[in-house]
Each structure stands twice: as structure tokens, then as C-alpha cells.
């Protein structure tokens, strides 16, 4: 297990907490030291619900270990008496699992009324996503019972969960589309489900599981054990939603014929029936993408990074429906990397061998993603909360499309990602996130009108080489500084000469600086590509041994780079 400042996934017992907090009549008890009770505040901070998190930490202290005492049985009895759950899930945290204690024996000795399940959420083998999905699959296998099918077409919706990315809004959107088709919802799980609801899962005609991260393994098991077909596509975007609806109708008609329960086959109603007012088009994306504003996006470059479901869905939405260029994508879910790579094979830039490995990134290290973004400098980044932080430093527009997220992505309002409504939300977010730039263009042309906008930071940049930092601009002034290494390995500066120079010291220790006339030319470049032009010219100057970038070198670099 790797420790870091930021991690894309929570620990294994955080995944257990997500399932317990999603369900009714289920409570999680963590056998953990005081420091591992951070999971509770995460839910109280982010989850917009009036209830307390359905989890309790049974503290393990150094005194307990020294005296050979265990608090877990007493904690289980207290939870059983006060909360009165139907099921208590017990698991060790990433710290106490090192003790290798017999939690089964401890839980059995508590003698609780509620059923107790000890879940082996080993943090050295799994993290949040696999832990949550594994637990939900286990609960499905444990409690699902053979049931007669419902009298009318019905579906299960598996996957929405506590702290899921816009899951509550997605659920509303799915319910609306199903109601339009005349299809009932049998069970939604884990969000809002009880143990009794899990028993009723086999009664549905089909199962909808739109998220690869949670619910699809349980859906496949229901198909294998009870013959309930699973629909695992993610309706992200207008065209994927249309395909999803057609496949759902086909699946339910096949199930109805097999079950001999359907007298009149289901049919898709007019598309206007799926709109909010019942009279207009269900989504505005098809016509909006052809407006003058959005057609300009066909020249914009995008980078997408996140979990499996939202990365694939967002890449296809940006390219297929908004016409943007995808310069790179990736995921932090290593166990889903092969599926994501296969889905994006025709969407990412390939090398001469046809491989997309150079443009596809699989990593759990957020610094690697930040470096890739800095190298590509796209006009739009779609990522997680970590990419949002990285892009703020790089002054690049970023929209959050996948967990991990912060409080602003757990909204009270209706903001789905799935379905026709989700397509409109995504298009709006892209449009309001990507920079149009009219304000900055006007400031460049007419001045700031006394508003004191900051100048683009072209004359002061820091370059870090190993443990050394080279200041390439005088703080608070526009005077460029020629940086070079002194005899002791330090860095000295001089602003005396602005002519082009050949670097005689190690090129690793010198960053080219901009002469005033070159800076003036750079400011004439539209701001939304200015950063990329600056970086390319600086790279060209460093490769050719120029310590100072003059107007002549800027023109030379532009011609050499094909600009």
C-alpha cells in the first residue's frame, strides 16, 4: 500500500463504508485505531444527506494491545442495541489488519441479535473500488432468493451508491426514462436498499448496471444464477442513450417472451416523450453542437483522466458529439486499464505502429498526470479533483468528471451525467469551463480600463532542475535575467546583455529568458494558445543553445515548428 498526499482511491474499509452508508438496516463497524476513523468525517463532509453515517469505529489502543483486551464485542453489542440494524459488517482497517486477529471469533462472541458479516477487506490487495464492488457482490450472492418474475416489465438498477459521482441525479434520470417506457423499477441497490430488497433482485426482468466500478459483477451473477439479463452499457451522451434505450426495449421484449408475461411488446415512444416538458427534443446537444460557438470547439484539444466509466464516456462524448480533438486520456484504475484501452483504441492518437500507448496513461500517481497535462497543454482537461488542483497551477480550464471529488460535486440540484439530461449538463459544463477569452482579448486590445488585471507571467518563470531552482525573471520587474551556474554550483544572475547567446554551461542549468521585444511579440499571440507557444519556443531555444529569446529567435522557432 502506498502512502501519498493525495490518492485517487480511498482505502479498502472506505469502500466498505460506502456500501454500508448506502443501504438501510446495514451498519459497518471498523476494528481500527483512533487515526483510522477519518472515514466518518469524509461522509459527513461530502454527503448531502440528513442522516449520520452508518458506521462506527471500534477503537484499538496501545493499552488494549498491551493488556490483551479487545473492545470489538462490546462495540458490536452497543451498535446492536442502539441502531438495531439487520446486518452488521465488520472489517479491519489498514492498520489493524497487520495484527492478524480472528475477527470471526470476536464477532461471534458478541452474541448480537443482528446478523454479523466479517468482510476481508485486505488493503494490501484492494482499494476502495474493488472493496466496495466485492462487498456488494457478496451481499447479493448471500441474500438474493429465487423469486417469481414481476407481472409487468421491471428492472433492477445496480451501482448508485453513497459518495458516487452524481449518482443520485443519475438515478432520477434513469427513473424518468424507465417511466416513459412504462417499465417499473424492481430494486435500486445499494443506494436505499435493505436486505429484504436484495432478496427480491431475481424478480426483475432485467438488470441495469451502468457503472463498471460498482454493480456489474453482481448483475452478471444474477444473470448466471437466475437468468436475469444484464445491461451494462453506460448511456453517456445522446447517441449512446438512444442505443441504450433500443437495447433495453429489445432485452425486455425478449425476457417477456421467455417468461410469457408480455402481451404487447414494448416500443420506443416519440423522443419528445423523454424531454422535461414532453413536447421538445430530449436534448439540445445535437443542434447546439452545430452553432458557431460550439463549432469553434472542433479546434480545441482535450485530455481526459478518471475512472473507467466516466473516462470512456467523456472521451466519446467530446469527440463524437462536440467534435473536440482528444490528445490523451487515462485512468487510475489499473484493473480496468485493458477495457478502457480497448474502448478508446479509435479515439486516441496512435504512433506509427498503431499503438495508443503513448497517449494512454495508466497511473495512480497524480504527479504523473500533472506532468502529462503540462506537456500537452490542452484547452480543456476533464479529470478528478486532483487534476483540478494541477490545472489551477497551470492556468488551464478543468472540469471534474469522475471521483475523487470535493463538496462542489455533491450538489443539491439535479445534475446527472447519464441520459439525455446528462448530455445537456455535460455540454453546458464543457462550454462554461473551456475559455472563450473575450474578456482577455479586449484587455489585450484596449487595456485593463484601470481594473489592474495581472499581466501574463511570461517574464518570470521558475525552472527546477534536480534540487536547484533557476530564477529567470527579476521579481516585480520586467527585466529579464541571464541565469548561469557559478563555480560552486550556485546560480547567479545578470541583466546586462540581451543579445542571443550560446550557453556554455550545462544546458540543464539554464532556462532561456525573453528579451523585451520577444515578449511584446508573444503578447500578440491569442492568450489561449500563448502558453503552448511560449513552452515550444523555450524548448526550441534550449535545444539550440540560446540563452536569450529575441524576436529573431522567436520567428526562427515559429518557422521551424511549422507555425
From Swiss-Prot:
Cofactor(s) this protein requires: [4Fe-4S] cluster
UniProt-annotated stretches for the region Disordered: 459-478
GO molecular function: 4 iron, 4 sulfur cluster binding; ATP binding; metal ion binding; oxidoreductase activity, acting on iron-sulfur proteins as donors; oxidoreductase activity, acting on the CH-CH group of donors, iron-sulfur protein as acceptor
Keywords in alphabetical order: 4Fe-4S, ATP-binding, Bacteriochlorophyll biosynthesis, Chlorophyll biosynthesis, Iron, Iron-sulfur, Metal-binding, Nucleotide-binding, Oxidoreductase, Photosynthesis
Gene3D superfamilies named among the record's database cross-references: 1.20.89.20, Nitrogenase molybdenum iron protein domain, Proto-chlorophyllide reductase 57 kD subunit B
Cofactor remark: Binds 1 [4Fe-4S] cluster per heterodimer. The cluster is bound at the heterodimer interface by residues from both subunits.
Residues engaged in binding substrate: 437-438
Family: Belongs to the ChlB/BchB/BchZ family.
Protein name per its UniProtKB record: Light-independent protochlorophyllide reductase subunit B
Protein species of origin: Roseiflexus castenholzii (strain DSM 13941 / HLO8)
Lineage, opening ranks: Bacteria, Bacillati, Chloroflexota, Chloroflexia, Chloroflexales
Gene field: bchB
Amino acid at each position: 500500500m502506498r502512502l501519498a498526499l493525495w490518492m485517487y482511491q480511498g482505502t479498502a474499509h472506505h469502500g466498505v463504508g460506502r456500501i454500508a452508508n448506502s443501504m438501510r438496516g446495514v451498519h459497518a463497524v471498523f476494528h481500527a485505531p483512533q487515526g483510522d476513523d477519518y472515514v466518518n468525517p469524509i461522509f459527513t463532509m461530502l454527503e448531502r444527506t440528513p442522516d449520520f453515517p452508518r458506521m462506527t469505529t471500534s477503537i484499538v489502543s496501545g493499552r488494549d494491545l498491551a493488556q490483551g483486551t479487545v473492545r470489538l464485542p462490546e462495540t458490536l453489542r452497543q451498535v446492536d442495541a442502539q441502531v438495531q440494524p439487520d446486518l452488521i459488517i465488520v472489517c479491519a482497517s489498514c492498520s489493524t489488519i497487520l495484527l492478524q486477529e480472528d475477527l470471526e471469533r470476536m464477532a461471534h462472541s458478541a452474541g448480537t441479535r443482528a446478523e454479523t458479516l466479517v468482510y476481508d477487506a485486505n488493503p494490501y490487495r484492494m482499494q476502495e473500488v474493488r472493496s466496495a464492488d466485492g462487498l456488494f457482490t457478496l451481499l447479493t450472492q448471500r441474500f438474493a432468493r429465487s423469486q417469481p418474475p414481476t407481472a409487468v416489465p421491471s428492472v433492477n438498477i445496480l451501482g448508485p451508491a453513497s459518495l458516487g459521482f452524481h449518482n443520485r441525479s443519475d438515478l432520477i434520470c434513469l427513473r424518468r426514462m424507465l417511466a416513459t417506457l412504462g417499465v417499473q423499477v424492481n430494486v435500486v441497490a445499494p443506494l436505499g436498499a435493505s436486505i429484504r430488497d436484495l432478496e427480491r433482485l431475481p424478480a426483475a426482468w432485467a438488470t441495469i448496471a451502468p457503472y463498471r466500478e460498482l454493480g456489474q459483477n453482481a448483475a452478471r451473477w444474477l444473470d448466471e444464477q437466475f437468468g436475469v439479463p444484464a445491461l451494462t452499457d453506460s448511456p453517456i451522451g445522446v447517441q449512446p442513450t438512444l442505443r441504450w434505450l433500443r437495447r433495453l426495449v429489445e432485452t425486455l421484449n425478449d425476457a417477456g417472451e421467455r417468461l410469457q408475461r408480455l402481451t404487447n411488446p414494448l416500443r420506443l415512444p416519440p423522443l419528445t416523450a423523454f424531454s422535461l416538458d414532453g413536447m421538445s427534443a430530449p436534448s439540445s446537444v445535437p443542434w447546439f453542437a452545430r452553432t458557431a460557438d460550439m463549432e469553434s470547439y472542433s479546434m480545441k484539444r482535450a485530455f481526459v483522466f478518471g475512472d473507467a466509466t466516466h473516462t470512456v464516456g467523456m472521451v466519446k462524448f467530446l469527440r463524437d458529439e462536440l467534435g473536440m480533438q482528444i490528445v490523451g486520456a487515462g485512468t487510475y484504475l489499473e484493473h480496468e486499464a485493458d477495457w478502457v484501452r480497448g474502448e478508446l483504441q479509435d479515439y486516441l492518437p496512435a504512433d506509427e505502429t498503431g499503438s495508443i500507448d503513448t497517449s494512454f496513461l495508466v497511473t495512480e500517481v497524480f504527479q504523473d498526470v500533472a506532468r502529462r497535462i503540462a506537456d500537452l497543454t490542452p484547452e480543456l482537461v476533464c479529470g478528478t479533483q486532483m487534476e483540478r488542483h494541477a490545472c489551477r497551477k497551470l492556468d488551464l480550464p478543468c472540469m471534474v468528471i469522475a471521483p475523487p471529488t470535493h463538496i462542489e460535486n455533491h450538489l443539491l440540484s439535479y445534475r446527472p451525467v447519464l441520459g439525455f439530461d446528462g448530455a445537456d449538463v455535460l455540454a453546458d459544463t464543457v462550454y462554461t469551463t473551456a475559455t472563450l477569452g473575450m474578456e482577455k482579448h479586449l484587455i489585450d486590445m484596449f487595456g485593463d480600463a484601470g481594473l489592474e488585471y495581472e499581466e501574463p507571467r511570461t517574464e518570470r518563470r521558475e525552472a527546477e532542475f534536480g534540487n536547484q531552482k533557476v530564477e529567470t525573471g527579476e521579481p516585480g520587474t520586467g527585466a529579464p535575467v541571464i541565469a548561469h551556474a557559478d563555480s560552486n554550483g550556485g546560480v547567479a544572475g545578470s541583466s546586462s546583455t540581451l543579445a542571443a547567446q550560446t550557453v556554455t554551461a550545462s544546458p540543464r542549468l539554464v532556462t532561456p529568458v525573453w528579451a523585451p521585444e520577444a515578449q511584446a511579440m508573444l503578447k500578440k499571440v491569442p492568450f489561449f494558445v500563448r502558453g503552448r507557444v511560449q513552452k515550444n519556443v523555450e524548448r526550441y531555444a534550449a535545444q539550440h543553445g540560446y540563452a536569450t529569446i529575441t524576436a529573431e529567435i522567436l520567428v526562427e522557432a515559429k518557422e521551424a515548428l511549422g507555425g
